């Protein structure tokens, strides 16, 4: 993709002295101040505030798609046609995610599949129960582990063959992140070793918080377009991986492999690592912290601020934003004062911060869609491209939605932060995978002003607007009858359509316990019938 402006992607950058978010939001024209000021309770429910006309400002949102040079009407039309056809049925295929410890590292440092015999038996049991397919994480840190451009697929060839022989389909998750934080740093899958060697010398290839702590689970967006990896940019590394995958598993595409989700951030989700629970820095329901203090992100911020004519805005992220475990009450930036998220600087920073995330998704999904499009042009069976977003549902009922802001979703009572995300997915013909299908507002303490239900409704609305598929997953482990019933009910969208598919997270020994299996099997069969 070509680079324009100061943000390294094919989105529109700076035009005519105004700073533009990649989605086309001008800081100087985006908001009009109303003459009437109202005193509002900071903690009132968003559902009571009319959308896009809440309080002091009126937003004028312009579509991301309208500004993109890579917009593909073919992808949009294909997506729309696909949604209309799929909505005629009411069945939801269920994929079960592989165990979190499926892969291990042997004494020689090479990856291996653990408990292969037990896995074979488990796959047969899931097939008999009516499960449609298996979701498999394909790790960058396994396949391209030792040297750049040396892809070793033998482990996945064995696993895919095993799943196919069991009569199951595949959802493949291409993972460009690490999950070592889930194992306390003493296990799991890291980023490729050659990437880590670069990171040992240059820690700024990773996200960094305001205290200087780095997060080596995923490369910072700041290096997306910088040739720091043996002459390749991060986006080129991701593209080469996807090309190698599609070449190796071409016979499976559209046949056994039905869905491919593209990793776009920590845990494969399009977001910043603003809530790092693995190392103890963050605990629910903290608001999190902005993750833009590596030198590459800060250099970009300074360049954008200078072009906006406000160089002083580029020297730091917003002050008075609290810390990881702060509550929004008493944190000035997330309230409504002069230095809040409503200020000129607050809007500037949030446009830039969220805009970098949108450009990141745009660049990678463009590469992924191009790879799959080549297969479709060769009259291969179609594969659904999928992108995951995080389920940041706490403090959702506040005006500022602080936990979403730190994660990179510029979603407030004044602005729909998921609309530009859905727009990017729409132009690339990708489906949106949403979390929290197992959750209800009534199950969460009211004092944290959570609303997984409100979040789901908002995402369903933008998905309908942009005519994209919606798939889903659970956030917490549920085997109880009520939790499974809740998932089933949430797989039916407000307009009566069903989700395209559901991924159950995840397979482990608990699922096969008699008391859980007796709930799980009826759940699978109900999902496989007309709902």
UniProtKB/Swiss-Prot annotation:
The domain of life is Eukaryota
The principal localisation class reads: plastid
In which compartments does the protein localize? Plastid, Chloroplast
This protein's transit peptide sits at: 1-62
> Which Gene3D superfamilies does this UniProt record tie to the protein?
Glycosidases
> How does gene deletion manifest?
Slightly retarded growth rate and reduced starch breakdown in leaves during the night.
Task: Check the record and name the InterPro entries matching this protein.
Answer: Glyco_hydro_14, Glyco_hydro_14B_pln, Glycoside_hydrolase_SF
Which GO cellular component term is one of those annotated? chloroplast
| Keyword vocabulary terms for this entry | Carbohydrate metabolism, Chloroplast, Plastid, Polysaccharide degradation, Transit peptide
Q: In which tissues is it expressed?
A: Preferentially expressed in vascular tissue of cotyledons, leaves, petioles, stems, petals, siliques and roots, particularly in phloem. Also present in root tip.
Name the Gene Ontology biological process terms.
starch catabolic process
The family assignment reads: Belongs to the glycosyl hydrolase 14 family.
Q: What does this protein do?
A: No alpha-1,4-glucan hydrolase activity, including beta-amylase, alpha-amylase, a-glucosidase or alpha-amyloglucosidase. However, facilitates or regulates starch breakdown, especially at night, by a mechanism involving direct interaction with starch or other alpha-1,4-glucan.
Identification of the protein by name: Inactive beta-amylase 4, chloroplastic
